[in-house]
Regions:
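Feature activates predominantly on carbohydrate-active enzymes
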Residues: 2-5, 13-24, 28, 65-259, ...
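C-terminal non-catalytic alpha-helical accessory regions
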Residues: 437, 441-710, 716
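Glycan-association/targeting regions that enable binding to alpha-glucans and other polysaccharides
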Residues: 720-855
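Conserved, mostly hydrophobic/aromatic
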Residues: 29, 87, 155, 283, ...
Length: 855
């Protein structure tokens, strides 16, 4: 179908954001050589009829418009297209879908795609956070108005409904005081305005620059509102030791202990008055934001400043250290309020919420210090997950934040995981997710480099704006968070336009590659902190104790070695050390082992490799867009092989450490060599492509590149070679126990996701027994594992009993009588194999447990 012109028929009551979306559609059509104008739906030629809410389209509808907010439908008959939205945002999404088709169409029909298309949101909140951490690198994008127009348009096009400009997140008070250098926007208020009645200023900052900063903030907020986006301003720091940071590049003058709270209160009210488009504020409410835990008076005053603005402003409180007193303070303001825990530590794992936190995250008997009495004391279980926030009758939102510890540089784009996040972000009454965008923390703590956000040293690889490398990433993430069943053409049209005949291989490669580092992050967790653990550019944790202490020693229990690094889900995964102990004890486990993880990683590596080989046969390989994708896919494939071999080597290493049996050395060395070879290949790829120093912080483990990590990885292999004999390792033969463990390791069979039939209610009544029945191929007594949806608690288990052709078990009413929902799974055996039901499926994107909601 060809188009001579297009008439866009807007309803009389169309909002500004709907008008903007219609204008954007017209602009895209004009670029494609097709004139457009506003007019009547009854006009001739091609008509895009825009229908709001309960309005009646002039064209009979073959579909029903969903009742959910932000839903939309597109359908057409001949040259007449109906864009039908439940509300303004739904209409924006419908019109931007048509604009997107017109922008990326490669055929005659510029609106080609799925018709009819009906979509409704899964995650209610779909937020993107952009962090200002470096004066050197971030002022460039902060002051670029066209960059903001394009960036915010991209977010609206991809179904995001919130943008968070995040300030003050670059340091953690007081732990980072010695590192404080670049403090631009760290304590944000005096960088933006003069607050009457307070003699507070940034000594080195001119009034002109301060005023420019505020005008830019106003501009960004207006542009977000124009596109129908909520504008969240995240203010992570409320104070630091202003007089005890001699290396800081800006000086905060005039703040005292006495006037801090009144100043912040007045500043918040003024800021919200000056920028009326702000819809919410995010606060870090534990000690790292500068306020000692338990100093509730400060927050009462600060939140009063929010309420004084005279309009609804969402008060979003970062989850770490959050207690019920803080929730009550927010509640008493009358403002909408939310808690935003971390999704999985400060990393990105698989989409499901971890079944259990690390042992180190359970509350200690005594808090580490008085000012950390919550985050390192009674509320420690909330440091890195949802804690006890998901009660049945909660009156606040729970919005998860995915931190950028896992993957910062390489392009990500797996539709499977993105759809999984769309489903799991609503877990047990949750409300959505905020993603710290690619390159978050770039140039942090004074490590900014001019032009550093582009990362490439090879000419011709950089995009105009740094975020444009990740266009596909934003697309897949936003659209599948919104609608996990979104049609494939919604991302393939982009790849077809940008990557030509390599499009399908780019899609496959990014899907395989996108699972690699989330899987590694979930299963290998030497540190929860993104300030220490960066699996993408990995600081090597050795198989035998040695190096690694500085990067990881503060955050994992000794011994500090690869096989003892905890997982981020101890309910479903065992470490190599735990696995070796089970083997030596002649026991088995229902949990996934490091060898299961290695097998998954090997499959992902093969998928990456095949996609690269196929893409190299295409004519489009010369395109920078294809090259950017394929080199990152190849690097991820190499990382998958590296970690697969490290996991395998760790199993042999842990048996060797426990027994000193000499025959264990060769298989250990074999896998260690393969790991080094995989990293050498990654280094070869990165050496001429990426800069030597990718800076995300001043410490060695937060900077560098794959090729600069190579010497430490090769050095470990040389150390391991010495285990062959001599020195303190004499020849030791295996006794019966050791030989049994070796034989069991060699004969190991993978844990599989179960195919058992489960019969259980989707909901329950508190105080009533909750019955679970299973049937299918079962070899021995299955076990029901269950827990409240509360990370402060540990899992319980009960053996299921035979009942007819299946097994049954009950979660007792005394246990269900709580304020929490339930989660559960079943472990069993089949033909000698451990079976988890439901377990993780082949896409690694599902929830490996069932959830029953309290009615």
């Amino acid at each position: 179908m060809t188009y001579a012109s297009v008439t866009i028929a807007l309803p009389a009551e169309a909002s500004d954001s709907v008008g903007w979306a219609a204008s954007e559609l017209g602009t895209v059509l004009k670029r494609r050589g097709i004139p457009s104008a506003e007019g009547s739906a009854a006009g001739g030629g091609t008509v895009v009829e825009v229908v709001t809410g309960n309005g009646k389209p002039s064209l009979n509808s073959p579909v029903e418009l969903p009742g959910k907010e932000e839903s939309f439908a597109l359908y057409r008959e001949g040259a007449h297209i109906v864009a039908w939205g439940r509300d303004d945002r739904g209409l924006v999404f419908a019109l931007m879908e048509l604009a997107d088709r017109a922008r990326y169409s490669t055929g005659e029909d510029i609106f080609e795609g799925t018709f009819p298309l009906v979509e409704k949101p899964s995650a209610r909140i779909r937020s993107m956070a952009r962090l200002f951490c470096s004066e050197e690198e971030d002022k460039v994008w902060f002051y670029d108005k066209q960059q903001w127009r394009d960036y915010l348009t991209m977010l609206a096009s991809n179904r995001f409904n919130r943008f968070s400009l995040t300030l003050g997140m670059g340091y953690n008070y007081p732990y980072h005081n010695p590192w404080i250098t670049d403090v631009y926007f760290y304590f944000p208020y005096p960088f933006l305005m003069k607050v009457p009645g307070f003699d507070v200023e940034i000594v080195e900052l001119s009034e002109e620059e301060r005023d420019t900063n505020l005008e830019m903030l106003k501009f960004i907020a207006r542009e977000a509102a124009k596109r129908g986006l909520e504008f969240q301003l995240a203010l992570w720091t409320q104070r630091y030791d202003f007089d005890d940071v001699p290396r800081a590049n800006y000086t905060v003058a005039g703040v005292t202990d006495a006037n801090l709270a009144p100043y912040c209160r007045a500043a918040l009210t003024q800021l919200l008055t000056e920028v009326p488009e702000i819809t919410g504020l995010t606060f870090r409410v534990h000690v790292e934001g500068g306020i000692a835990e338990g100093e509730y008076g400060f927050w009462e005053e600060a939140f009063a400043g929010v309420a004084a603005a005279g309009r609804p402003i969402e008060i979003d409180m970062h989850g770490k250290g959050l207690d019920h007193k803080m929730l009550q303070i927010a509640r008493e303001t009358g403002m909408p309020f939310a808690a935003s825990p971390k999704y999985l530590a400060e990393h990105m794992g698989l989409p499901y919420h971890q079944s259990a936190i690390r042992d180190r995250e359970y509350p200690p008997e005594v808090a580490r210090s008085e000012r950390e009495k919550l985050s390192e004391g009674s509320r420690k279980f909330l440091r890195y997950s949802y804690g006890d926030l998901l009660t049945k009758d909660k009156d606040y939102k729970v919005i998860y934040r995915i931190w950028a510890g896992t993957q910062r540089v390489l392009l990500w784009g797996d539709p499977d995981l993105a759809a999984g996040y769309g489903r799991s972000s609503m877990f047990a009454g949750s409300d959505g997710v905020e993603w710290c965008e690619p390159q978050s923390f770039k140039g942090r703590m004074g490590t900014g480099i001019p032009g550093g956000r582009f990362n490439y040293q090879k000419q011709g690889m950089a995009t105009r704006y740094d975020w444009q490398k990740y266009d596909y990433q934003y697309r897949v993430w936003g659209r599948l968070l919104y609608h996990p069943e979104a049609p494939r053409d919604s991302w393939m049209r982009y790849l077809a336009r940008e990557c030509g005949d390599a499009a399908e291989y780019c899609e496959k490669g990014l899907s395989f590659a996108g699972k690699v580092l989330p899987l590694v992050s979930l299963t290998h967790g030497p540190s929860v902190s993104n300030n220490h653990y960066w699996p993408e550019v990995y600081t090597n944790l050795p198989l035998i104790e040695g190096t690694g202490q500085r990067a990881y020693g503060f955050d994992m229990d000794a011994p500090v070695r690869f096989g003892n690094a905890p997982t981020f889900d101890s309910a479903l995964f065992v470490t190599a050390r735990e696995y070796a102990e089970l083997l030596l004890a002649g026991k088995t486990s229902h949990r996934y082992t490091p060898l299961d993880i290695a097998d998954w990683l090997e499959e992902l590596a093969e998928g990456c490799n095949q996609a690269v080989l196929d893409a190299k046969k295409t004519a489009s390989l010369v395109s920078p867009a294809v090259q950017r994708i394929m080199v990152d896919v190849e690097i991820c494939g190499g990382l998958a092989r590296f970690f697969a071999e490290k996991f395998r080597a760790a199993c042999w290493a842990e048996l060797f450490i426990a027994t000193k049996v000499s025959s264990l050395v060769e298989p250990l060395l074999d896998h260690a060599r393969r790991a080094v070879m995989a990293w050498e290949r990654v280094a070869d790829i990165s050496r001429d492509l990426y800069h030597d120093d990718l800076t995300y912080g001043p410490q060695s483990w937060l900077r560098g590149s794959w090729h600069t990590r190579l010497p430490q990885i090769q050095a470990e292999l040389l150390d391991l070679e010495s285990l062959r004999g001599g020195g303190k390792y004499e020849s030791v033969k295996a006794d019966g126990t050791a030989q049994g463990a070796i034989d069991a390791l060699k004969a190991r069979r993978a844990v599989v996701a179960g195919s058992l039939d489960i019969e259980a209610a989707a909901s329950f009544t508190a105080g009533a027994d909750f019955d679970v029945r299973i049937s299918g191929q079962i070899e021995d007594e299955p076990v029901l594992h269950y827990r409240h949806v509360n990370q402060a608690e540990r899992w319980k288990s009960v053996k299921m009993v035979r009942n007819g052709d299946g097994y049954v078990a009950s979660i007792p009413g005394d246990y269900t009588r709580s304020e929490f929902h339930l989660q559960y799974f079943v472990s069993s055996k089949r033909n000698g194999q451990a079976v988890l039901t439901p377990g993780l499926d082949g896409k690694l994107a599902n929830e490996p447990y069932y959830t029953a909601l309290q009615s």
